[in-house]
Amino acid sequence: MATVIRLTRMGRKKQPFYRIAVTDSRKRRDGGWIELIGHHNPMVAEKTTVVDNERLDYWLSVGAKMSDRVKKITGR
């Protein structure tokens, strides 16, 4: 199973926020996930991002790959 760390869109129309989720690469964007490791809210004045770095490091150590957007948000 190829695991990917990517964003899932939540919120309502024109007011999105995103969860940072570990999921199987074959699932849809908002499909089932294995674990939620953070969230990102781009709609507030200061864009807030909360990530559980310990779990992020764990998933990277077992071979999960980050999407380009998650790399940019987390600064890794």
UniProtKB/Swiss-Prot annotation:
Keyword list, A-Z: Ribonucleoprotein, Ribosomal protein
Gene3D superfamilies: 3.30.1320.10
InterPro entries given in the database record: Ribosomal_bS16, Ribosomal_bS16_CS, Ribosomal_bS16_dom_sf
SUPFAM superfamilies: Ribosomal protein S16 (SSF54565)
Entry's Gene Ontology cellular component terms: cytoplasm; small ribosomal subunit
Gene Ontology terms: biological process: translation
Molecular function via GO: structural constituent of ribosome
Family: Belongs to the bacterial ribosomal protein bS16 family.
Name of the molecule in the record: Small ribosomal subunit protein bS16
Lineage, opening ranks: Bacteria, Pseudomonadati, Campylobacterota, Epsilonproteobacteria, Campylobacterales
